[in-house]
C-alpha cells in the first residue's frame, strides 16, 4: 500500500490517476483475495488458463488482451444466444480481473477521503462503523421533527449508467474500457439466469466489486442533497467535506433546472430549513424535517425529477413515502420507530388561585417488529410460521456444547442488536423460541423427549441465553434493583454492533 500511495502522490499524477498499470501487479490480486503478499494466488490449473502459469503478471496481461480480442467478436447485441464472448473461460477471466480492479480503483478515493478527514480533524471511519450510532442520532433529533420521508434508492437499470457514473470519477480511459468489458462479460454470462443489466450480478461472486459499484451509484443519488444544501448559504459546509469532488455536475444539473423551474435560484428558499436531517443505510434512507408537509413534498418532487433526469430512468414516486412522526411509525434497520406524545398535568397554585398546566413531552419510541423476526426464524427453521419452536437440523459431528454455543451466539446477537427497544416483550418471545428450539434440537439428537431432556439437565439449562445481558446491565446500573426489572424499561444501545449475522450461517 505504501508503494501505491507513493506512486499516486507523485507530482505528475496528482491531478489524474493512471490506475491501469496496477492491474498487472500480482500483489493487487493478493490484496483482493486477502492472501499473503509473498504467495501467488493466480496459479490455476493449465486446463483453466490455457497457458503457462509461471508468471502471474504475464497471466493477467494475457487475460486482458484476450478480453479485448474476444469483445470484437460479439455478433449481435440483440440476440441473447449469440451475444457471447468467444472462449470457454471468460467468466473466470473477467471475475479475476474485476477483483483486482476493485482494489485498484479504491486507492485514490481512499487517499482523498483520508486526507480530507485529516485536514478537518474528523475521527477515522472505523470509529463510525456502528449502525447503532444512527439510533442515538434519531433519539436526539427526531423528537423535534414533524415529518419523515421513507426513501428507497432506485437501482440502475443499465450497466452503461454505472460506467458513465464512474467516468466522472476516473479519468483513466483504459481502466474505463476494461470496466465496461468486465461489466458486459458478467451481463452476458448471467443473462439467462438473472435480470439483465442489474447490479445484483456481482453481489455473490465478487462482493468487493459489487460494493464499490453500489457505493458509487448511491453517492450519485445522494449528491443532490449536497448541492442543494450548499447553495442557499453560499458556503462550503463542513458536514459534506468528506465527499469527493465531482466534475461536470453543473452541466448535468442544467437540464434538471429547466424541468423544475425556469429560475432555479427562486426555489432555493425551500431548502433553507436548518432542521432537515438525512440518514441512509444500504439502499434505504430517511429524510426528516421540522417544517411543514409542503417542504417535504417539494423535496420528494425534486428527488424524483433529479433521478429521472440524471439516470435516465423512471423513478416511481411511490418509492418515497411521507409520514407524520406522531401518527405513523417508519421501519428502519429492524425497528419500528416513531415519536410519541406523553402528556402530563401539573397543578400549580398562586395565592388563592390554582390552575392546571397540560404539557406534552415528545419521546422517541423504538419497537421490535415481531412478525418479521418470526419470519426470519421460520426461514432459518428455528420455528414455524406461527412462531412455534421446532428442532433445527444439525450436522451429526456437532457436539452438544457446539450446538449450545451456536444457539447462544444467535440469541446474544439478537438481544444486543434489539436492546434499544422501548418494549422488550417481543425480544423475550424471540429468546423463548430460540431456547425451546435448542432444547428440541438436543433432545432430537439424543432421541429423547423434550420433557425428559429438560428434567435431566435441570433448571440451569441454557442460562447463558439470559445471563449476559443482565451482567452487562449490572455494570451499567450498579444499584440494588434487579437488572431484569431494569432491562424491561431501560433502553441500551450496544454501539459495538456492526451487523446482525445471518441466522442460517450459524447452524
UniProtKB/Swiss-Prot annotation:
Keyword Metal-binding: no
UniProt keyword Plastid, yes or no: yes
Role this protein plays: Usually encoded in the trnK tRNA gene intron. Probably assists in splicing its own and other chloroplast group II introns.
Pfam families registered for this protein in UniProt: Intron_maturas2 (PF01348), MatK_N (PF01824)
Descriptive protein name: Maturase K
Family: Belongs to the intron maturase 2 family. MatK subfamily.
Biological classification of the source: Eukaryota, Viridiplantae, Streptophyta, Embryophyta, Tracheophyta
GO cellular component labels: chloroplast
GO BP field: mRNA processing; RNA splicing; tRNA processing
Keywords annotated in UniProt: Chloroplast, mRNA processing, Plastid, RNA-binding, tRNA processing
Disulfide bonds: none
GO molecular function annotations of the record: RNA binding
Origin superkingdom: Eukaryota
Principal location listed in the UniProt entry: plastid
Compartment(s) of residence: Plastid, Chloroplast
UniProt cross-references to HAMAP family, sorted A to Z: MatK (MF_01390)
